[in-house]
Structures are given as C-alpha cells and as structure tokens.
C-alpha cells in the first residue's frame, strides 16, 4: 500500500509541468495564456501561416527557413518618417543582442510594396546597416502581406483583424513568434523598455522550447 502511494505521488509530481513565464496568444484580442509548454501544444491552435516573399537581396524568402527559430516581426515602409525610423532603431537593438545566434531571426515586412521593391529594401538595409544573415526585409503582394499581418500576426489586434486590404496597414507593434509558429509577445516597437522586455522574452523562449517547428 505504501509503495502504491509513493508511486502515485511520483507520477503526480511528474505530471505537474511548470507554467511558462512568457504567455501564449491565440486570438487577436491578445488574451494571455500562462500555461505550461506541454499544455500549450493542445490548447494553442493559432499558428503563423506559411509565407514567401522576396528579401532585400532579391532572394525568395520562405517561412520554412524559420523552422526551429524564435523570430521577431514588424511592419514598416521605407518612406515612413515618423514611427518607422524609431522601430528600426529598436529592432537594431534586438539584432545586436542576438547577432551571433543562428536560432533567432528578425523579419520586417513592407506595408507599401508598390514603392518598396527589392532595390528600395536593399538601400534601406544599407542605410541602417542591416545584416541579411539574420534580418530579412520582405516585399511582395500587398494583399498577401496585409492578410498575413492582420490575420496571422494579429498586427493590428482585434480592431484590424477583419479589415480589407484596401485599408492602409500602419502599426508600431512588434510580434514575437516561437519555434512552433505561435505568438508569444506583442510590443510597442518605438519604446526602449518594450524592446528590453522583448529581448528578455526572446532569450527565455529560445532557451526553454525545443527547436521543432511547423511554420
């Protein structure tokens, strides 16, 4: 009887997996789920949908290249003179923090692809000294980018989820995605404190999840 009790206690202890310090997000209203990683595999159904666009080097960039990586995404345009320079400066801080880590990536999507062709993105990358080894600037179909931003990345939260692609997309949000394509954070890309929190979250997520992903 005593042995059975000890076995039951052991099994109970093994079943109690720790709750993640970094929340999971499943809906565009960004309700946080502080659950264990094991529970998230069954509870969190939302994943970033597959995508493919051209980067600043004129190469086709496919989301499958992000498999097994933690990445940070934002939405900018090269002619933006208000929030985009600040957002790029803060993204540079993230790039610097993980410049030697091949399991962390940054992705910036242009929201004015009719202006921002690969040549424009290349000039932008040169201006801000962006390394294409871990930071990709992407352009492509406006409709594809806008749909991906609003319905996969929840870039404009609930208010923008069902907007038509004819409505201009402009957001300061930076979105953190884990190795399994799940959203783990949303930050104001113009605020240094938010950037610090994002860097901490990237570090935590990178170290605590296995590098198995379906993007």
PLM features per residue range, with description:
Residues 63-85, 91:
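Short active-site neighborhood of thiol/selenol oxidoreductases, capturing the structured segment around
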Residues 2-50:
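N-terminal targeting signals for export/organelle localization
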Residues 143-197:
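Thiol/disulfide oxidoreductase modules built on the thioredoxin-like
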Residues 48-49, 71, 171-173:
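Short loop/turn microsegments at loop-to-beta-strand junctions
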Residues 88-148:
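Structural microenvironment flanking redox-active thiols in thiol-disulfide oxidoreductases
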Residues 205-211:
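Conserved small/polar residues in nucleotide/adenosyl-binding loops
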């Amino acid at each position: 009887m005593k042995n059975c009790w000890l076995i039951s206690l052991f099994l109970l202890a093994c079943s109690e997996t720790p709750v993640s310090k970094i929340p999971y997000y499943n809906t565009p209203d960004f309700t946080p789920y502080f659950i264990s990683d094991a529970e998230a595999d069954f509870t969190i159904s939302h994943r970033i949908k597959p995508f493919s666009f051209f980067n600043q080097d004129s190469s086709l960039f496919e989301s499958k290249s992000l498999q097994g990586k933690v990445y940070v995404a934002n939405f900018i345009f090269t002619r933006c003179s208000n929030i985009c320079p600040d957002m790029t400066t803060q993204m540079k801080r993230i790039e610097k923090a993980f410049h030697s880590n091949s399991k962390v990536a940054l992705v910036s999507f242009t929201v004015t692809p009719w202006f921002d062709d690969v040549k424009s993105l290349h000039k932008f990358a040169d201006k801000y000294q962006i390394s294409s080894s871990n930071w990709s600037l992407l352009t492509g179909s406006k409709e594809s980018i806008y749909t991906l931003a609003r319905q996969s990345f929840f870039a404009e939260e609930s208010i923008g989820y069902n907007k038509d692609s004819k409505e201009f997309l402009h957001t300061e949000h930076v979105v953190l995605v884990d190795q399994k394509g799940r959203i783990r954070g949303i930050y104001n890309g113009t605020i240094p404190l938010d950037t610090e929190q994002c860097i901490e979250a990237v570090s935590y997520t990178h170290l605590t999840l296995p590098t198995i992903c379906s993007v």
